[in-house]
């Protein structure tokens, strides 16, 4: 090191890097191995904290107590309560506080998945106060009680002077040895607090919020019952008051089943809290249960502890005050007049020695007494079954039983769920030799004598007698358990597995239209439902053009019946009856400048308006072809209109596009040949038609002027 001469160190050759180093378990300094240092002698206590064993230290031959610390979860590690208890016990040194002698470690076995555990080693104490008070052979005098109470106040006063709260004062945590020394134990809930230490008048001040779920319920003070979190050392003094009262009752004085019941038992003894007896109690969270506890604020401790002296009763009332600020402290309790009156407290060595008594021993003793109190009745002699006399011919019983068939089977599970399950056959005699296949049913009658049965003569009618009702009728030839409907089950039939027509509702009760029903159902529709099935009859060869302005018929948005044999993109309107529609050109649209065959449309090659009235006389209309309709003669007037002229829908020239049609097309379609009276093409004479022209490919034509 710096400033010191270098010491000569023994060096060894450097080991290779891949050299395997043997495993050496780490050592715990300050801890011993429990299997090497201690010999277990038996269990003396158990609880949520762990288990306590009595053991003998091998080196010193003295008896110690091993408190096993339970490791509930490997993820959580060592319990915080155990660490707090070890730290506090290391800081305390007092005759009336249990010391921590050692920490022992038991290694686990990874191959067997056994965890290691830690033991806290403390001196062995022969008794705990709960075991002494539960042992009826232990009789305590007032001097003995005062001696124990003084030692208890000394220990708790030292703890409070060090600014620690025990928070679990109860009879089971107060230990006593054969020398009469009392020691406080179990500091798992103890913790320090900030604030001034208590004196002879006040219990100190605490400004920090602490957990309220502390102290065993039977020893819990009223401020914790009401949910106060800024409690002081007064909670330990309430527990000492409960222990003092337990000296005389030999059992807990407030054994509540719940927090509310605990409050009820406390307030029944010391009175319901008021602003005078417990200032500020109404603002605590637990004050909402005040309607359960009543309104009686009378202190009844003098009636419950009538055998106590006046000073003893005053000392008990001072420890069990509702107001924690006025409750006796450890210093004030030691100076109380109760310890200065006769009989005076004895010295610890003057206390008698009793047999070792712990709380666990009391539990074992009570279980043993409970088992001994249960006297087992002598076993009853098994009586032979009593057969009922039979009046019928005994020769029938000699017949062999018939073969079992389907009638002997129970109904299969799940088949008769809608009916009640058959009940078991009632107890009673069976059919003698034929009943050997029913041993699962009891066949014994109650062990009593049957009354004699006097049958009246057949020729006289006697009223029934009560003793005749006590007798069962003679059994039938074959008894069956009560069944429902068709049991025994019938043989399988096809109709049991196939639906029947009568299981379904009538077909006419369906709510969908008649057209969607089965075609085999040819029954007529009722008049009341006729309007729901009424629909227009469409004929693809009749003139049934749809008109938006036709209000006399109900408007149904139904499409035309589709004909799969027709090209739906070819035309839109239904052709007229008796005439085949004109075929339209197929393939891609012609390019500009190509020669286009005339399909009834009037246009020229260059897409320019015509100069003459008749487009056939123009040179620029040489590619238009003949006009639609019958051919015109070379010379002479045009022929009269045909009796069956082409419809405007065939040429697309006599009407507007299908998506822009209206009633005007109906008015103008009366001249169905598509020409004017003088024979001119109406598509060229009417600017309205020329303005809205579309070719067969859906393209809008240029505007043609006369």
Curated annotation (Swiss-Prot):
Residues 625-648 have a biased composition (Pro residues). The keyword RNA-binding does not apply. InterPro entries: CDK, Kinase-like_dom_sf, Prot_kinase_dom, Protein_kinase_ATP_BS, Ser/Thr_kinase_AS. The active site is at 168 (proton acceptor). Its main location: nucleus. Residues 38-339 form the Protein kinase domain. Its EC number is 2.7.11.22, 2.7.11.23. It comes from the Eukaryota. GO terms for cellular component: nucleus. It is found in: Nucleus. GO terms for molecular function: ATP binding; cyclin-dependent protein serine/threonine kinase activity; protein serine kinase activity; RNA polymerase II CTD heptapeptide repeat kinase activity. It catalyses: L-seryl-[protein] + ATP = O-phospho-L-seryl-[protein] + ADP + H(+); L-threonyl-[protein] + ATP = O-phospho-L-threonyl-[protein] + ADP + H(+); [DNA-directed RNA polymerase] + ATP = phospho-[DNA-directed RNA polymerase] + ADP + H(+). GO terms for biological process: positive regulation of transcription elongation by RNA polymerase II. Residues 360-523, 545-570, 594-623, 659-706 have a biased composition (Basic and acidic residues). Belongs to the protein kinase superfamily. CMGC Ser/Thr protein kinase family. CDC2/CDKX subfamily. This is Serine/threonine-protein kinase BUR1. It comes from Yarrowia lipolytica (strain CLIB 122 / E 150) (Yeast). The gene is BUR1.
């Amino acid at each position: 090191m710096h400033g010191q001469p270098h010491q000569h160190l023994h060096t060894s050759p450097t080991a290779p890097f891949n050299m395997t180093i043997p495993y050496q378990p780490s050592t715990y300094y300050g801890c011993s191995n429990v299997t090497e240092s201690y010999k277990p002698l038996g269990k003396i206590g158990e609880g949520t904290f762990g288990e306590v064993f009595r053991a003998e230290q091998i080196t010193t031959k003295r008896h110690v107590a091993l408190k096993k610390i339970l490791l509930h979860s490997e993820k959580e590690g060592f319990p915080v309560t155990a660490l707090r208890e070890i730290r506090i016990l290391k800081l305390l040194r007092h005759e009336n506080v249990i010391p921590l002698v050692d920490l022992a470690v038991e290694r686990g076995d990874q191959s067997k998945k056994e965890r290691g555990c830690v033991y806290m080693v403390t001196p062995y104490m022969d008794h705990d106060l709960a075991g002494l008070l539960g042992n009826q052979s232990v009789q305590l005098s007032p001097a003995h009680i005062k001696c124990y109470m003084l030692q208890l106040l000394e220990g708790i006063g030292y703890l409070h002077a060090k600014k620690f709260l025990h928070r679990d004062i109860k009879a089971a945590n107060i230990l006593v040895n054969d020398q009469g020394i009392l020691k406080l134990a179990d500091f798992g809930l103890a913790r320090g607090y900030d604030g001034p230490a208590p004196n002879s008048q006040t219990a100190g001040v605490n400004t920090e919020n602490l957990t309220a779920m502390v102290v065993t319920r039977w020893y819990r003070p009223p401020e914790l019952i009401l949910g106060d979190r800024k409690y002081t050392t007064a909670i330990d003094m309430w527990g000492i008051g409960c222990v003092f009262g337990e000296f005389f009752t030999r059992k807990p004085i407030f054994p509540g089943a719940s927090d509310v019941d605990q409050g009820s038992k406390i307030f029944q003894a010391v009175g319901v809290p008021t602003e005078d007896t417990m200032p500020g109690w109404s603002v605590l969270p637990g004050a909402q249960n005040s309607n359960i506890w009543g309104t009686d604020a009378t202190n009844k401790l003098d009636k419950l502890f009538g055998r106590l002296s006046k000073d003893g009763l005053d000392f008990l009332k001072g420890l069990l005050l509702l107001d924690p600020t006025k409750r006796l402290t450890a210093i004030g309790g030691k100076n109380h007049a109760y310890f200065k009156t006769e009989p005076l407290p004895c010295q610890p060595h003057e206390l008698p020695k009793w047999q070792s008594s712990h709380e666990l021993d009391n539990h074992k003793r009570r279980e043993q007494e409970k088992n001994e109190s249960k006297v087992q009745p002598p076993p009853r002699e098994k009586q032979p079954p009593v057969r009922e006399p039979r009046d019928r011919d005994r020769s029938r019983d000699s017949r062999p039983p018939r073969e079992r068939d389907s009638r002997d089977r129970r109904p299969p599970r799940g088949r008769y769920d809608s009916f009640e399950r058959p009940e078991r056959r009632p107890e009673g005699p069976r059919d003698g030799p034929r009943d050997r296949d029913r041993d699962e049913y009891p066949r014994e009658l109650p062990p009593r004598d049957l009354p004699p049965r006097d049958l009246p003569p057949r020729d006289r009618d006697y009223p029934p007698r009560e003793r005749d009702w006590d007798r069962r009728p003679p059994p039938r030839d074959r008894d069956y358990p009560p069944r429902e409907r068709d049991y025994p089950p019938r043989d399988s039939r096809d109709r049991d597995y196939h639906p029947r027509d009568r299981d379904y509702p009538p077909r006419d009760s369906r709510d969908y239209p008649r057209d969607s029903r089965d075609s085999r159902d040819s029954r007529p529709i009722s008049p009341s439902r006729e309007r729901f099935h009424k629909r227009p009859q469409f004929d693809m060869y009749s003139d049934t053009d749809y008109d938006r302005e036709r209000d006399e018929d109900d408007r149904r948005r139904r499409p035309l019946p589709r004909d799969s044999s027709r090209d739906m993109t070819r035309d839109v309107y239904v052709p007229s009856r008796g005439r085949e529609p004109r075929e339209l050109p197929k393939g891609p649209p012609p390019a500009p400048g190509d020669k286009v065959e005339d399909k009834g449309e009037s246009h020229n090659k260059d897409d320019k308006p015509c100069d003459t009235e008749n487009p056939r006389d123009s040179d620029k209309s040489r590619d238009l072809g003949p006009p639609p309709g019958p051919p015109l003669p070379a010379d002479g007037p045009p022929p009269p209109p045909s009796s069956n002229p082409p419809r405007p829908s065939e040429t697309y020239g006599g009407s507007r596009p299908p998506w822009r049609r209206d009633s005007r097309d109906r008015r103008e379609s009366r001249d169905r040949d598509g020409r004017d009276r003088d024979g001119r093409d109406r598509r060229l004479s009417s600017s309205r038609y020329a303005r809205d022209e579309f070719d067969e490919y859906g393209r809008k034509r240029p505007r043609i002027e006369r």
